[in-house]
Amino acid sequence: MNQAIAKQDRPVDLLKATINAPSIQEQFKNALGEHKDTFVASLIDLYTGDKSLQTCKPSAIIIEALRAATLRLPLNKALGFAYIVVYNNSVKVTNEQTGREEWIKVPTPTFIPGYKGYIQLAMRTGQYRTINADVVYEGEVRKVNKLTGEIAFDGEKTSDKIIGYFCYFELLNGFSKTLYVTVEDMAAYAKRYSPSVKKETTVAQLIAKANDGIIGKKVGWEGNFNDMA
């Protein structure tokens, strides 16, 4: 009997119990239709393989998963369309023993579209002829026109060193735009604005991740810098 209770208390069992609630099932069905079961299965797989997610309340995870479901973006790390990232947010609570207010860290799941997800959402509008994004290697940037914002990437690649990232889009009406950010600027941005980057992580360490060829198990800048960029 004790073993049965312990099994029921496993985090994944608590998540499944929450998902199986009729109201939650209805929300997933409304968002996904016949694809509901596949999406829920991928959510459970994601949760089972991510210890940080297991520290969060199941109800909070499902709220974020429903956001992905509403946008019809799969929650599969390997696909890169959408992620649920855990941030340790500061929350003010009242200490029951002292009666005083204090700040504590609470693991908070957060839905974040991946770059492939953003591209898919944009293409669904029917307004884009082309959308592309990729890394830029040393030697490929031939010319940058500050006045017009035009950038020529037709230079000869001289090494496998990643020096930056670009994105390009063209609308059906002919308007087009190219954006380019260096690895250094991207690392500085991540360090300054991303809650997922540890305080002790330096900009230099983030820059190194762009070229170390290592894809970590974590989601975010420290797990896969180039995908985030």
Predicted regions and their residues:
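Intrinsically disordered, compositionally biased charged tails
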Residues: 1-9
